[in-house]
């Protein structure tokens, strides 16, 4: 009787150990499998590939520049041909005068949006491309006319740089913004009517390869 | 006694079935894990990315063109700036200085390329449109002995896709080849490998 019990006890322990090992193995393998699936998914959903495909429908050629500083191991920064490259963005100066909303639509049709200015260096770069006798829509507007300006890409306005001309903005009815050259303050921002016609500047993020 | 035996048998069957299920599960999971690791590895070792890294050391600009026909879902094909695209290759004419065949190949290598390998009449026609009729250009073809011509990238030498000038090749000791213009046409001429000529470099396009 006693021997039988001991024998049975040992058997049960042995079986439990084996089952534990089996279950642990399965759990480990499941975890590894799920982890590697997630990694694979990340690769497949890689942003550059998707954006490259999107741009394919808007543009017929790209120019890629070797980036000295490697951005997460990506060594090439690409812009569509004829777009200007600066920092991590590409820019195109539109030479057609249009309403603000039409200008934005035209940018969107190229996979871009009206320009959002984040730094003084960026504004300096942009203004070097511009004609001093023209004005250009920015991606900045005050849709409600209550002084709450907003960038078109949702960059917070309150924390961002501002380059208004002196005494601007000056009219609640002027709910869109253009960049324009005035003496003596040179390039700066001016609030304008959204349904007035101006040139515009499109911006898109570079594609990094 | 009789009852005991069937009971024990049943228990054994039950355990075996469970163990079989467990083993099969583990095998399936192992297979899935290995398969997904292989897939991930393939993606990581994706050729364009490696070539992009390599090209980074040779060139500072790439120009990419939209591909009408999608080559395995790649919608862009790229060549370094100032290189000319044709088919699935990029071409560059080296005219900065004449050099021997070895030196010419070295210069191509320094650009991540090799001396040109010509596969068809159309390709040769395209290349020669870039060239100066007064000059000769090394191509990536040489005689490794006994008139055994060999392309530098191991492409099999195809007698039906050769464009020798009439009467060429004409000397056993001339073991390298240039593309040059004679009378009214471009063709191949065997020359001494130490002669100094211009050259044409070729590399595969990068597909994105």
UniProtKB/Swiss-Prot annotation, chain A:
GO biological process entries: adaptive immune response; antifungal innate immune response; defense response to fungus; detection of yeast; innate immune response; positive regulation of canonical NF-kappaB signal transduction; positive regulation of cytokine production; positive regulation of intracellular signal transduction
Membrane topology classification: Single-pass type II membrane protein
Secretion signal, residue range per the UniProt entry: none
Positions annotated to bind Ca(2+) 2: 168, 170, 174, 190-191
Annotated TM spans: 21-43
A GO term for molecular function: D-mannose binding
Tissue expression notes: Expressed by the XS52 DC (dendritic cell) line (at protein level). Expressed constitutively by the epidermis, and skin resident DC appear to be the major source of this expression. Expressed in the spleen and thymus. Expression was undetectable in non-DC lines, including macrophage lines (J774 and Raw), T-cell lines (7-17, HDK-1, and D10), B-cell hybridoma (5C5), a keratinocyte line (Pam 212), and a fibroblast line (NS01).
Gene3D superfamilies xrefs: Mannose-Binding Protein A, subunit A
Subunit structure, interactors included: Associated with FCER1G. Heterodimer with CLEC4D; this heterodimer forms a pattern recognition receptor (PRR) against fungal infection.
Full protein name: C-type lectin domain family 6 member A
């Amino acid at each position: 009787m006693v021997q039988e019990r001991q024998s049975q006890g040992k058997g049960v322990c042995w079986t439990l150990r084996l089952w534990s090992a089996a279950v642990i193995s399965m759990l480990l393998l499941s975890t590894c499998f799920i982890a590697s699936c997630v990694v694979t998914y990340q690769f497949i959903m890689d942003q550059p590939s998707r954006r490259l495909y999107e741009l394919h429908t808007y543009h017929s050629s790209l120019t890629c520049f070797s980036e000295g500083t490697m951005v997460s191991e990506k060594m090439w920064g690409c812009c569509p041909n004829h777009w200007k490259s600066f920092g991590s963005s590409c820019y195109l100066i539109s030479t057609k005068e249009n309403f603000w909303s039409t200008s934005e639509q035209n940018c969107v049709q190229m996979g871009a949006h009206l320009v959002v200015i984040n730094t003084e260096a960026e504004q300096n770069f942009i203004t070097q491309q511009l004609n001093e006798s023209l004005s250009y829509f920015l991606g900045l507007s005050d849709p409600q006319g209550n002084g709450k300006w907003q960038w078109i890409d949702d960059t917070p306005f309150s924390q961002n740089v501002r380059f208004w001309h002196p005494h601007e903005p000056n009219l609640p009815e002027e709910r869109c913004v253009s960049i324009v050259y005035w003496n003596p303050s040179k390039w700066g921002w001016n609030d304008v009517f959204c349904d007035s016609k101006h040139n515009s500047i499109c911006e898109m993020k570079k594609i990094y390869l | 006694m009789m009852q005991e035996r069937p009971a024990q048998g049943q228990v054994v069957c039950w355990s075996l079935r469970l163990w079989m299920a467990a083993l099969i599960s583990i095998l399936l999971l192992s297979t899935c894990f290995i398969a997904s690791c292989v897939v991930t590895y393939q993606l990581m070792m994706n050729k364009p990315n490696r070539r992009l890294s390599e090209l980074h050391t040779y060139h500072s600009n790439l120009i990419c063109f939209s591909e009408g026909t999608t080559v395995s879902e790649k919608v862009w094909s790229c060549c370094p700036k100032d290189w000319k695209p044709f088919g699935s290759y990029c071409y560059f004419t080296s005219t900065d200085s004449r050099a021997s065949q070895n030196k010419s190949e070295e210069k191509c290598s320094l650009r991540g390329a090799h001396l040109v390998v010509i596969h068809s009449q159309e390709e040769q026609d395209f290349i020669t449109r870039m060239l100066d009729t007064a000059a000769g250009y090394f191509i990536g073809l040489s005689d490794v002995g006994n008139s055994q011509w060999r392309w530098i990238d191991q492409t099999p030498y195809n007698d039906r896709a050769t464009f020798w000038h009439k009467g060429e090749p004409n000397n056993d000791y001339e073991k390298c080849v240039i593309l040059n213009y004679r009378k009214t046409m471009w063709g191949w001429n065997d020359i001494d490998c130490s002669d100094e000529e211009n050259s044409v470099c070729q590399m595969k396009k990068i597909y994105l």
